[in-house]
Amino acid sequence: MDKNLLEAVKFDEKGLVCAIAQDAETKRVLMVAWMNAEALQKTVETGFAHYYSRSRQKQWMKGEESGHTQKVRELRLDCDGDAIVMLIAQNGGIACHTGRESCFYKVWRGSAWETADAVLKDEKEIYGSTH
């Protein structure tokens, strides 16, 4: 592991740090996930976003199933060292597992959350019927 890469990052008690994927061109926030030290190291080594799945308890590369990979253009660490922003190029224009550009597709409209973004590709087309 690269000590210079990891020493400034404040991983939580579970060894994770918040990772935000933001489109490098539009600046739209596409998703928020978690990274452990291994996922961060793999991201730097490969140039593609890797995360740690809390539900599956394993590291994964974004797009390994869907093909919607995230090419990292820049990594930024916040002032407290406990959150990372990755400026990325989103392959296929879909970051969300629901088939939308962003995971942040719901908008509060005063009394309810409304879906603001259309599905670009159906989940079954992306992952097959087993997802």
From Swiss-Prot:
Give the PANTHER family listed for this entry: HISTIDINE BIOSYNTHESIS BIFUNCTIONAL PROTEIN (PTHR42945), HISTIDINE BIOSYNTHESIS BIFUNCTIONAL PROTEIN HIS7 (PTHR42945:SF1)
Q: Please tell me where this protein is predominantly located.
A: cytoplasm
Q: How is the cofactor bound?
A: Binds 1 Mg(2+) ion per subunit. Binds 1 zinc ion per subunit.
Reaction catalysed by this enzyme: 1-(5-phospho-beta-D-ribosyl)-5'-AMP + H2O = 1-(5-phospho-beta-D-ribosyl)-5-[(5-phospho-beta-D-ribosylamino)methylideneamino]imidazole-4-carboxamide
Q: Which family does it belong to?
A: Belongs to the PRA-CH family.
Chain's role: Catalyzes the hydrolysis of the adenine ring of phosphoribosyl-AMP.
High-level lineage: Bacteria, Pseudomonadati, Pseudomonadota, Betaproteobacteria, Neisseriales
Instruction: Give EC number(s), comma-separated.
Output: 3.5.4.19
Q: Which Pfam family, an example, fits this chain? A: PRA-CH
Provide the binding site for Mg(2+): D78, D80, D82
For the ligand (Zn(2+)), the binding residues are C79, C96, C103
What is annotated about its quaternary structure and interactions?
Answer: Homodimer.
Gene Ontology molecular function terms on file:
magnesium ion binding; phosphoribosyl-AMP cyclohydrolase activity; zinc ion binding
Q: Enumerate the InterPro entries for this protein.
A: PRA-CH, PRib_AMP_CycHydrolase_dom, PRib_AMP_CycHydrolase_sf
GO cellular component, as recorded? cytoplasm
Spell out the protein name for this chain.
Phosphoribosyl-AMP cyclohydrolase
- Organism name: Neisseria meningitidis serogroup C / serotype 2a (strain ATCC 700532 / DSM 15464 / FAM18)
Subcellular location per UniProt equals: Cytoplasm
Q: Which NCBIfam families match?
A: PRK00051.1
Primary enzyme class: hydrolase
Q: Record's superkingdom?
A: Bacteria
Functional pathway: Amino-acid biosynthesis; L-histidine biosynthesis; L-histidine from 5-phospho-alpha-D-ribose 1-diphosphate: step 3/9
Record keywords: Amino-acid biosynthesis, Cytoplasm, Histidine biosynthesis, Hydrolase, Magnesium, Metal-binding, Zinc
Question: Which metal ions or organic cofactors does this protein require, according to UniProt?
Answer: Mg(2+); Zn(2+)
Any one GO biological process: L-histidine biosynthetic process
